[in-house]
């Protein structure tokens, strides 16, 4: 669907293993290649190493291979993906790409209701369209950060919730939050109301002094579980972790583009790849996520649209930008002290970036500064996570993991596994079902979707990777 640019000079072929649905694990195929753009085509099982040769190992059955065209750019670590294995070194850089299906926003600080009818809204150009029910949503030196980048071809299947409830009108929700918030005045907006404004302010103030004397680092791990129906082809989610630069990002391609014959997974993958490239140009220790997203959006030309959340630990604290219904939360001493709010134009119509100026712009994203200290845990994810787990459920897993000295990779897997379990439970109340009921639907249970989870432990920089 997307033409391969003439400038692509080399290819690196990645072995990708697919297993039974369960936990998502990663084992790196360690090599260096340049600027993977995530455009996937069928390939043979040969493995071509670019720039230098290293020992490669694949653990688990390998059943499918892809090739990733590349152009000159920063070095990456290529990761294999195997769903039924719990494999990975949490100290290694990780990234993965995934999928998307249904709709709905669930947490928002202040909501304005209005009524509209879902359906197709025409856009600019003969091949453009906006699906209001689901369209949500350079030269580098040799010492570039080693990042992991793992690509999947996006699935082309999408399900409208209102197809099960045709003829029903529904209320739209619109977030009226300001575009720039700080941890001092941004409340936790989860449905379980576990944190108040005063708690956030007090916690942030008490941590701020610690930042002045303690250089910090992020120790991160990730897990991705595709929608069961999209396991073979991947999906529309994407994420990256840059360990050296202390940055990470998640994106959720809007599956509704499949109705127009467009795979939005290309867009989210290219957006995250361009975000990694932009991070390489940022001053060390002073990454500006908003500037990174602006550059990445400008460079992303694939058709489709996506949500985006980029987070960076800098000398001044945790900086982030979030656009749409992906997001992140910060857990401290067993409590959720911060949760990024969801952005959406109307019910089931999230903010989304799109190539050109047809969608929302990066400037519409909400920018956050959060004071953090050693012992804090950051959880970032797509709506497949936050639609199915309340804040206190995520926090409970984090508390257990910290006490048991479990690394962030396994913690991410445990969170993703519980989110998948909740998604398949037709009787349990979830953030998704609560939001649907508030919008006038008789809906119970979770929302089956792609699930991307990134867990980062905040540690003193002198520590060796354990929380």
From Swiss-Prot:
Binding site for Mn(2+) 1: 252-253
Cofactor(s) needed for function: Mg(2+); Mn(2+)
Pfam families (UniProt xref): PP2C_2 (PF13672)
Signal peptide: none
Catalytic reactions on record: O-phospho-L-seryl-[protein] + H2O = L-seryl-[protein] + phosphate; O-phospho-L-threonyl-[protein] + H2O = L-threonyl-[protein] + phosphate
PPM-type phosphatase domain boundaries: 222-458
Record keywords, A-Z: Hydrolase, Magnesium, Manganese, Metal-binding, Protein phosphatase
Family in the record: Belongs to the PP2C family.
Cysteine-cysteine disulfides: none
UniProt protein name: Probable protein phosphatase 2C 55
Free-text cofactor note: Binds 2 magnesium or manganese ions per subunit.
Binding site for Mn(2+) 2: 252, 383, 449
GO molecular function, one term: protein serine/threonine phosphatase activity
Lineage of the organism: Eukaryota, Viridiplantae, Streptophyta, Embryophyta, Tracheophyta
EC annotation from Swiss-Prot or TrEMBL: 3.1.3.16
Enzyme class: hydrolase
């Amino acid at each position: 669907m997307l033409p391969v640019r003439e400038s692509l000079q080399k290819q690196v072929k990645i072995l990708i293993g697919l297993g039974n649905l369960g936990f998502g694990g990663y084992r790196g195929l360690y090599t260096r290649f340049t600027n993977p753009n995530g455009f996937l085509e069928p390939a043979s099982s040969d493995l071509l190493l670019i720039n230098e040769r290293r020992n490669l190992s694949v653990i688990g059955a390998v059943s499918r291979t892809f090739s990733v065209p590349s152009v000159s750019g920063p070095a990456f670590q290529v990761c294999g993906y195997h769903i039924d294995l719990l494999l990975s070194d949490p100290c290694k850089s990780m990234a993965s790409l995934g999928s998307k299906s249904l709709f709905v926003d669930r947490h928002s600080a202040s909501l304005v209701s209005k009524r509209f009818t879902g359906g197709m809204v025409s856009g600019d150009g003969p091949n453009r369209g906006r699906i209001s029910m689901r369209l949500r949503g350079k030269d580098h030196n040799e010492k570039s950060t080693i990042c992991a980048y793992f690509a999947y071809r996006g699935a082309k299947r999408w399900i409208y919730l209102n197809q099960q409830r045709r003829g029903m009108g529904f209320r739209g929700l619109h977030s009226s939050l300001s575009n720039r918030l700080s941890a001092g005045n941004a409340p936790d907006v989860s449905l379980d109301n576990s944190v108040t404004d005063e708690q956030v302010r007090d916690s942030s103030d008490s941590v701020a002094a610690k930042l002045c004397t303690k250089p910090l680092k992020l120790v991160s791990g990730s897990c991705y579980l595709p929608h069961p129906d999209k396991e073979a082809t991947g999906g529309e989610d994407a994420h990256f972790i840059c360990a050296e630069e202390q940055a990470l990002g998640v994106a959720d391609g809007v599956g509704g583009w499949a109705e127009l014959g467009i795979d939005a997974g290309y867009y989210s993958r290219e957006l995250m790849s361009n975000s990694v490239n932009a991070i390489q140009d940022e001053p060390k220790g002073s990454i500006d996520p908003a500037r990174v997203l602006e550059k990445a959006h400008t460079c992303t030309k694939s058709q489709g649209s996506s949500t985006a959340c980029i987070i960076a630990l800098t000398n001044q604290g945790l900086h982030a930008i979030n656009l749409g219904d992906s997001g992140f939360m910060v857990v401290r001493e067993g409590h959720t002290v911060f949760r990024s709010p969801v952005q959406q134009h109307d019910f089931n119509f999230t903010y989304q970036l799109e190539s050109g100026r047809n969608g929302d712009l990066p400037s519409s994203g909400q920018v956050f500064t959060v004071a953090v200290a050693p012992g804090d845990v950051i959880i970032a994810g797509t709506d497949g996570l936050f639609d199915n787990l309340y804040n206190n459920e995520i926090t409970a897993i984090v508390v257990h993991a910290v006490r048991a000295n479990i690394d962030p990779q396994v913690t991410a897997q445990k969170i993703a596994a519980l989110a998948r379990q909740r998604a398949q439970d037709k009787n349990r109340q979830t953030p998704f079902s609560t939001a649907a009921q508030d919008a006038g639907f008789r809906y119970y249970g979770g929302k089956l979707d792609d699930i991307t989870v990134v867990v980062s432990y905040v540690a003193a920089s002198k520590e060796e990777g354990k929380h």
